[in-house]
Design a protein with these regions (language model features):
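Bacterial N-terminal signal peptides
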Residues: 7-14
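Pepsin/retropepsin-fold aspartyl endopeptidases
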Residues: 5, 18-420
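Bacterial N-terminal signal peptides that target proteins for export
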Residues: 1-7
Length: 420
């Protein structure tokens, strides 16, 4: 269930190349681009961490507080709810097509100009925002709370950004006022290409072979590691399972899930890392010929094990291990069902997909079943993250479900199984 959310963002927007300040003089960007109000040098703002995604409070023009995902993998600011743009009277100057990963066609979107965007003490007075014509991503259903949009590069390019996953605190600092010290962690060089941060100092050990790779550091992907088998030397592990990895702007993303025995960054080493491998038809075939070379990306399930500081201006990232989370096991759903959250408060859970040969499959669960109770607990009392944890607790753990199917109550029982 979790992987659908985990891989979605790193793939869905990978082909967007749009400069929200294109054509603006440098001095005008200083006035109207992202900045901290009242000459502040730094600001802190709490964030929510859901499904390993960073969710921050944002306002557009005179809107109520909106929830945006902070995503290093996306270039422009994207509003996924066209109804909000219409309500706010956002001015569209032209339409565009967004090509995504998957089997579908390009998605229409509008480019709006002259917007005021604020996040705490950060603001932009004339901000360009891309508005999707339809909510094809369905991010709210995946995360289990209202999600209204995504942004990233414009923030990371303007400030030194420190993400404290343990305290769920985001710090923005004006680059000229930021000073690095060794106690903040180890520095690793990154290169910014086409709005994305690339890290080269990483090694994976797979099938008894050490392989240096180049990856995107992607805070908008909830998974741990994604590898692209269409590039040289990247191979599937000996044990993998086929899976529907997610749904991007272009449709369904299929592939495999496996484990990489070791992933090493400098002196830091993590083992048995859960890794996704998108099919070449869904991933490699759609990468533009002039796209920067890479073997994959590191997402939130990996990054949350560190306190992370991105310094695009100086060209490095700082990693400091989170002692409480660094050695957490990488676990995948053990039920075999993907679930979507719906309803007013996103506390109604429906089965979206059943993995063939999984415990849920053998127990007779079907797509569109509504979960009502799990082990005598009403699912209305559970957030999506809590439900995810229940379904990946422990191999052999018995699950007793009450579901609604076509207006009838149905009982289903199965034991969790570690399928990968």
């Amino acid at each position: 269930m979790k992987i659908r959310c985990l891989i979605l963002l790193c793939l869905a927007l990978i082909l967007i190349n749009y400069d929200s300040h294109a054509g603006k003089p440098a001095d005008q960007e200083e006035v109207h681009g992202l900045h901290l109000v009242h000459g502040r040098r730094t600001m802190k703002i709490p964030f929510e961490l859901r499904s390993n995604l960073i969710i921050v409070p944002v306002r557009i023009n005179k809107s109520e507080v909106l929830r945006f995902i902070l995503d290093t993998g996306v270039g422009p600011t994207i509003l996924t709810d066209a109804a909000i743009a219409q309500k706010l009277g956002m001015k569209s100057i032209r339409t565009m097509k967004i090509d995504g990963i998957g089997k579908g066609e390009a998605i229409p979107a509008d480019i709006t100009i002259g917007n005021r965007l604020t996040m705490g003490a950060m603001q932009s007075l004339k901000h360009n925002i891309v508005v999707l014509d339809s909510d094809i991503l369905r991010l709210s259903e995946l995360v289990g709370t209202s999600i209204h949009g995504i942004f990233g590069y414009e923030v990371f390019n303007k400030f030194v950004v420190t993400i404290d996953f343990q305290r769920q605190l985001l710090t923005l600092t004006v680059p000229k006022k930021y000073e690095y010290s060794a106690k903040q962690g180890d520095r690793f060089p990154i290169v910014i290409e086409k709005t994305k941060p690339y890290l080269e100092g990483i090694t994976v050990v797979n099938n008894d072979t050490e392989l240096p790779i180049r990856v995107v550091l992607d805070t908008g992907a909830g998974h741990a590691l994604m590898l692209n088998t269409t590039t040289n030397n990247v191979q599937l592990p000996q044990k993998v399972m086929k899976a529907q990895l997610g749904v991007g702007l272009g449709g369904v993303i299929n592939g495999h899930i496996g484990r990489i025995p070791k992933v090493r960054i400098g002196e830091y080493e993590l083992t048995d890392v859960l890794t996704t491998f998108p099919d070449s038809n869904a991933f490699g075939m759609k990468i533009a010929t002039n796209a920067p070379q890479r073997e994959g990306n590191l997402g939130g399930e990996f990054l949350r094990r560190f306190k992370v500081t991105f310094n695009y201006d100086a060209g490095y990232v700082v990693l400091k291990p989170n002692k409480k989370r660094f050695y957490d096991k990488f676990e995948h759903d053990m039920s075999g069902m993907d679930v979507r959250a719906k309803g007013m408060n996103f506390r109604q859970y429906y089965v979206e997909h059943i993995l063939e040969g999984s415990p849920a499959h053998f127990a007779g669960l079907q797509e569109n079943d509504e979960l009502l109770f799990i082990n005598n607990q009403s699912v209305e009392d559970l957030e999506m993250a809590e439900l995810n944890r229940i379904l990946q607790q422990k191999e052999g753990k018995e699950m007793r479900l009450v579901i609604r199917r076509n207006g009838r109550l149905v009982l289903a029982n199965f034991a969790l199984k570690r399928m990968i």
